[in-house]
């Protein structure tokens, strides 16, 4: 496959991943991990998905290690881990 074809395929896969709605059954497994600040001493405002409250919450990330349940914005956390609300149109 040519590099142009691979680039097109990558673009289509990225678009599909962004537009596919998240449900509780296909939510990524890392969304169920606890917030992990990591071992370093930076002070980075981040967000994690709290599977008990079903909300994205703020925490302070130390800058290294940690886990994949770590997002730079609340919106990115919601897009990745939170199921859309039923009966609500946006």
From Swiss-Prot:
Pfam families attached to this UniProt entry: Kunitz_BPTI
Annotated site residue numbers, Reactive bond for chymotrypsin: 41-42
Matching PROSITE patterns: BPTI_KUNITZ_1 (PS00280), BPTI_KUNITZ_2 (PS50279)
Protein's UniProt keywords contain Ribonucleoprotein: no
SUPFAM superfamilies tied to this protein: BPTI-like
Native source organism of the sequence: Daboia siamensis
Tissue: Expressed by the venom gland.
UniProt function note: Serine protease inhibitor.
UniProt lineage: Eukaryota, Metazoa, Chordata, Craniata, Vertebrata
UniProt keywords, alphabetically: Cleavage on pair of basic residues, Disulfide bond, Protease inhibitor, Secreted, Serine protease inhibitor, Signal
Domain of life the protein comes from: Eukaryota
Record-level Gene Ontology MF annotations: serine-type endopeptidase inhibitor activity
CDD domains documented for this protein: Kunitz_PPTI-like (cd22608)
Family: Belongs to the venom Kunitz-type family.
Disulfide pairings: 31-81, 40-64, 56-77
Propeptide: 85-90
Name of the protein: Kunitz-type serine protease inhibitor C4
Main location: secreted
């Amino acid at each position: 496959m040519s590099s142009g074809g691979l680039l097109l395929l990558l673009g289509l896969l990225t678009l599909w991943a962004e537009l596919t709605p998240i449900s509780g059954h296909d939510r990524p497994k890392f969304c169920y991990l606890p917030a992990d600040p990591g071992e370093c001493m930076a002070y980075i405002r981040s967000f994690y998905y709290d599977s008990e409250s079903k909300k994205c919450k703020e925490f302070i990330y130390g800058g290294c290690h940690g886990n994949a349940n770590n997002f730079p914005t609340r919106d990115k956390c919601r897009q990745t881990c939170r199921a859309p609300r039923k009966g609500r149109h946006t």
